[in-house]
Amino acid sequence: MEFIISFLPAFGIVALFFVFWKNSWVSKQPVGDEKMSNIAKNIAEGAMSFLKAEYKILSVFVVAVAVLLVFKGNSEEGSNSMVAVSFVVGAICSALAGFIGMKVATKANVRTTNAARSSLAKALEVAFAGGSVMGLGVVGLGVLGLSSLFMIYSSMEWGTNIEMVLNVLSGFSLGASSIALFARVGGGIYTKAADV
């Protein structure tokens, strides 16, 4: 069991290598004419501006919740303040996955449109490659983050208590889910405003 767990971070790294490989492949696809390129550039700039503004606000939320988790971990019996570390790592992994997804989505959109001019099969290939970057980015960061934290916590003095380790690791899910929720709601509002 321990042998398998020690290899888990490597699987996360392999997934991230695949992400960067597919991202570079999508980037090499032709963008199209100047009008398409300009529209794509404006969409990408708007999306990244939104993401920066959203992440600034979310960083305040993450710090505030982490402080509360430290306080709760130190004041309640059977709890551990390290859950705050798991929360922050989960939030960072989720935010990084969102950043990667936004970058590749804005790249893949225009390239898929351009590929559709020549063939539907080529457009599907570009679109699928763009989607796989986001999917494997989430998986790679999740596996890397969780398995690394598990190995670190297991080596601590309280690491022999598997129930405590799993309770502390639950902070990772809370951090990742919190960022994903805010990104989903905020992104929906942003795209609706852009439509209007």
Regions found by a protein language model. Name each.
Residues 1-196:
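Hydrophobic, small-residue-rich transmembrane alpha-helices and their short perimembrane loops
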